[in-house]
Amino acid sequence: MSYVQEPFEKLDVMNNFLFNQLSTNPKTKEGFLRCLIRNLLGKEIGKIVIRAENMIYPTLPDKRGVRLDVQIDELNLKDDITTIYDIEPHRDFERDYPKKIRFSQAQIDKNSMSSGNNDFSCLPELFIVNITNYDPFGDDQMVYTFQKKCIEAPEVVYNDGVTILYFNTTGTKGGSDDLKKFLEYLEKSEPEKAVTFATQELQGYVEQIKHDAEIGGNYMTFGDLLDKITAEVAAEAAEKATAEAAAEAAKVAAEKDAIIAEKEAIIAELQAKLDKQQNQ
């Protein structure tokens, strides 16, 4: 079964390929990511370092690392990292995603402290921004914001510097009309959806990528590669299934032969007893 590839010109910002291109292309990456942070978080950010598809490797060979779609480090005048933004678009529901975020946060924090540094006030503020085209919590909110608080005294804030947000492109509650239009554009990135200043800015970045013939060619190559991988995986699965079926058939045949042999032994034993009785 081949991978069904969306036409390049129809890709939306939520598509992993287009999002990656927008986040890495020198012509679009800084403007695009600043636009996201400005309109999703309501923040203007200063000097930044962009780490697209940032891989945080494990410290031990038998442990797991983590890949972030795009990490943005905001710097102060001394070039120290003061805030980290991890932006992740998601088009597929994951039941255990909050725990996946917990793991990602631990990896980000681990990489934010140098060995021997015991001053935890240096740990940057962290915003984990998830953009989903489904409602992860079922309350129809445009945005779900999570920060730690005390259960017994909810007014007590546990300030560990971490804010986790889910922006739901299908939500209708809890946000402004501009935010709703912005989220709708992220899910369906068509010129007709670019009806606000912010969405028109996004549309400009999207057009720069889609009008680039080299990127379009890379996308077609990407699709061919996925087709090849899909075919190889299918062939391996079929080969494994055939081998497993053959092994199972051999097992059944062996069990059948064992039962027949056991019955034949019993019959032979009975026959021997009958022969002995007849000869007496």
Where are these regions (language model features)?
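Accessory alpha/beta interaction modules
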Residues: 1-163
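Short, charged alpha-helical interaction segments and adjacent helix-coil junctions
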Residues: 2-10, 73-81, 85-90, 177-280
